[in-house]
Amino acid sequence: MINVRNLRLNYGASEILNIPRLDIDVSKITALTGSNGSGKSTLMRVMSFLQKPTSGEVRLWGSSAPSLNLLRDVSVLLPEPALLKRSVRENFKAVLKSRGVLGEFDERASEALNLVGLDESFLNKRHFELSSGQTQRVSFALNLALRSRLYLLDEPTNSVDVGTSKLFGKAVLYMRQRYGCGFVIASHDDKWLSAVAEENVFLHKGRVCEFEYKNIFDARDGVLKFDENTVVNLPSNLRSATKIAVNPGKITLSKTPIDGCLSGILHSVSLYLGKELLVKIKVGDFLIKTLAPNSQNFSVGENIYFKFDEEAFLGLE
């Protein structure tokens, strides 16, 4: 487990992180999501013990001061990884030697390169011969070759195309199944991340939030207006709010009209965290994101009815 308690991190007068409590099951694949500046990368550095917080503590497998041997069970991939200024082969030798498994070079290097879609001819390439996308692939492969107990991946799909992103996703799932590896992954690629993750932690302005802010709308005079026929009156305590987040998990969906419902066109359906459906409803010029059980059947383009629960709304501004 990773256990975060009373964590605060400030840069001067600016508060970057403020997390009273967070528990992450590191045997699973956990998504760390949030907009730019939400604190994802900073939290990843703190959880990997690369950066000290201003106050509070992080415990990794019960230890707030993990030994070097314990930290060897963790692999960290940063957004802009740098290779040693040597051949790819020498990079693999260096990382495998650091973990005492250099004798398994052939097996581990071959498997890792294959997982990221590269053949063994890349072992002979020098670092300067690689494109940014190839550098990202090799860096990820170096981490995979370690078969670590836990991976902390910060924007792993940076600089790679859609096809390579899919390979990375398959690699994560393979390592989880084959070696029991756990992952905490921060990424702006929500679609890619939701396809591989089992759990989600959402950050907003350095704080862990109850739900992911997929629905953010402007409000005026206590009203959300999606089109001329779709108007939602907000609870009295939010009448002065100008920006509202709507919890996707607190929207009821129906294929037939229900009391007090609104209607729209079903825009798209995709799997979310492997256990729910992310259903997008088009209403006027807006897309409303909702979550539904994976057992429900929907057809894109059909009329869909929905109703906001009373506790669905959160005032942001």
Map each language-model feature to its residues.
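Conserved ABC ATPase signature
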Residues: 126-130
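Helix-to-loop junction immediately C-terminal to a conserved catalytic motif
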Residues: 48
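Non-catalytic connector elements of ABC transporters
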Residues: 225-317
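Conserved catalytic motifs of ABC-family nucleotide-binding domains
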Residues: 80-90
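Conserved ABC ATPase "signature" region
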Residues: 104-122
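Catalytic Walker B motif of ABC-type/P-loop ATPase nucleotide-binding domains
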Residues: 151-155
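Conserved ABC transporter NBD signature motif
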Residues: 56-70
